[in-house]
Amino acid sequence: MSSYYNKGDAPSWEALDQDGLDDVIDTSEYAYASRDHILFCIDAAQSMHKPYPDTTDESGQLVRGRSALHQALDVAQQIQRAKVLSGPDDSVGLLLYNVDPSAVAEDPGNYQPGNYVFQTLRTINAEEMKRLVKLMQTAKEQYEAQDDDETVETTEPEILRKTFPPIEESHEMNIANVIQTCNFLFRDGGTQLRGNKRVFWITDNDMPPGMNNRQPARTSYGDLTTYGVTAETFFIDRPDHRFNPNIFWNDILDREAIDYNDDQPDPEGLSSLADLMKDLVIKTSPKRTHFHVPLKLGKDGEIVIGVSGCSMVSEQGKGASRYVKMRGQVVEEVQSKTEYTSAETGAVLKDSEIGQAYEFGNEAEVRNILEPNPWEAHVKERAKNQNAVDHVLEDDKERRQREDEGEDLEEEEEDDKKGVEKWMGKQKAALPKIVARTRLQFSNEEVSQFRSMGIEPQIKVLGFQAASQLRFQDNLKHPFFIYPNEEEYTGSTRTFAALLNSCLKYNRHALALCRLRSNHVPEFCVLIPQEEKTSSNGQEYPPGFHLIILPYKDSIRPPPKKVAEFLQSPPIATDEQINAMKAVIKRTRFKAAAYRPEIYPNPSLAYHYDQLQALAFEEDWDPEDPAKQALDKTMPLYGGMHSRAGEFMEEFNKEIENDERAVEKLAAPTKRGKAEKETTVNEWDLRNIPDMWKKGTLSQCKVQELKDWAKHYHVPLQGKTKKADIIDVVSEHLSTSEDDLAGASSKKAKK
């Protein structure tokens, strides 16, 4: 679904859809996320077929002028291609009028002769759009095939004049009949056309037939607006005439007259339609209502109102892929089904037989989790084993007491040991093998209870704080915007407005405990009030609360040590460096002095969408095509930046190079090789190398044992890798420091 809305036409609380459960798309008739139904109504008279004058580009190459009809159809095609992905539930139709009915093979049907319905108003369909795409592809090939000779007159692609032959000027259609045809097309769409219904009217004739009797046109347009359709006009200047909407169109469309000045006509003719293309091609995700929960106030939550929340920021992805099955020309989606089977029997398990388990302890010791568990044995068997264990422990305790009293129990201990071993052997043979209990199993209800801590989805206000209590670094997660919901609790809007006004009056925000959805855990949050702001264009910011989830202690980590040290005493730039950077920034700012993220689509998604379009329309996709490389709108304009600020960039770089603080210390080159694994060896884990040296058995040691001993006692091996060479180095070291090492060895032996 698309999310078209006029600038400043922000929705109010009532405009938000209240139906559905969590994470449902708002399908209301208001601005947030309604469907878009567009009917292109294009004038195909003789003047629309005339190409505009030729121009030259920056390199001096000849650029052939295109006709207004050619440009309008090209924009209509691009908008439809964009809506295949950005608004698959939207509808687009294409109506051309002032087409010669005698030269068109298709029957106009129930519509007035002279109207050519090239595409009926219906949901976006790639198969139907291929007709327009192939038409424009042929027109592009014929347009580019024209000679580059400037003396040769530019002509319109033959395919356009053949497909939409213009009617004679004396037989051009009355605008009332054209508006009536638009009305029929929208009514034929039925009740499915819910949402924004618009007609894009494109013409260059400011004095069409029907000027002397305008009442039929006014009546037809009134019927169109009654059905909820709005008209957006794109008037085209002819090369020798500037379009004047005050003559006819403003009167018919019930618009106020504008201050018309007879300036030079627009050389391109369709600048406004090009701007429209920039706005409509922007791919935006629909706004979603993420939760509907009660908001509780008072000591024990005595006051309860209903609120809904929508996400202010969400990450747009490529969408989930689906498994499909190709059956000729039909593509069917495969229905996925997941089943769990028992590892012991292979039987399919029911949902009630599957739970969740958590592990603890050393799982590496668990060899086979399918063996019987002692906790699951019979009660009598467990009691018998426990009695035997208690008997052994009691005997051991008694024997220790007698030993403390000085009795000689060596023979008795030997007999007891043999008896215990014999008894244990019988027990092991009788009992199945068991494993350590490292898994705890819970039902889904128990896991849900653990996660929710018994708190139902709600927002419970705990108190109020001053704005000074907020810290910027606590804003880690995406915020939500909440507004009242009258669906569950009547009077929620009044109570919500009173709470909002009180917070704004005293400059306070609410501290709350929230659990926004049934699969969420309880979290602390703050409700920051937002005051309604309006302008001449309407509502700029709606009233409500921004819900910001606060982090737990485990979610906060200190910055790296080097970063913390840098922030404590950062190097300060000199005045010369600051002035040089000011000059660079001044010449590389955005023209609008503001960053508009909506005009910079994600390059990865842009490539993904374009490839999907190519697949849908059976087109080749060449990544080396300049048009495909231009999809990345985030690529910096290096040429323009260097031309405007290149001199100042060089000056800034010189200032940095002359600063002694910016000198970097280069590390000495190191040989490439397999890095030795750094290990810490305990002294008690080392082999007794001195004793083995005295006995002449060093050759029995492993190379790694010799290296560990040499590393621990800081004996340089001088790059020796062979065992014989290492033994020679160790022997030489021991022979020179035999006394010291002997003392160390004796100390180790005593311990």
From Swiss-Prot:
It is found in: Nucleus; Chromosome, Telomere. SMART domains: Ku78. Heterodimer of Ku70 and Ku80. GO terms for biological process: DNA recombination; double-strand break repair via nonhomologous end joining; telomere maintenance. Single-stranded DNA-dependent ATP-dependent helicase. Involved in non-homologous end joining (NHEJ) DNA double strand break repair. DNA-binding is sequence-independent but has a high affinity to nicks in double-stranded DNA and to the ends of duplex DNA. Binds to naturally occurring chromosomal ends, and therefore provides chromosomal end protection. Required also for telomere recombination to repair telomeric ends in the absence of telomerase. KU70, of the KU70/KU80 heterodimer, binds to the stem loop of TLC1, the RNA component of telomerase. Involved in telomere maintenance. Belongs to the ku70 family. Its EC number is 3.6.4.12. GO terms for cellular component: chromosome, telomeric region; Ku70:Ku80 complex. This is ATP-dependent DNA helicase II subunit 1. Its main location: nucleus. Residues 381-423 are annotated as: Disordered. Residues 295-587 form the Ku domain. Keywords: ATP-binding, Chromosome, DNA damage, DNA recombination, DNA repair, DNA-binding, Helicase, Hydrolase, Nucleotide-binding, Nucleus, Telomere. InterPro entries: Ku70, Ku70/Ku80_beta-barrel_dom, KU70_core_dom, Ku_C, Ku_N, SAP_dom_sf, SPOC-like_C_dom_sf, vWFA_dom_sf. PANTHER family: KU AUTOANTIGEN DNA HELICASE (PTHR12604), X-RAY REPAIR CROSS-COMPLEMENTING PROTEIN 6 (PTHR12604:SF2). SUPFAM superfamilies: SAP domain, SPOC domain-like, vWA-like. Residues 404-415 have a biased composition (Acidic residues). One of its GO terms (molecular function) is telomeric DNA binding.
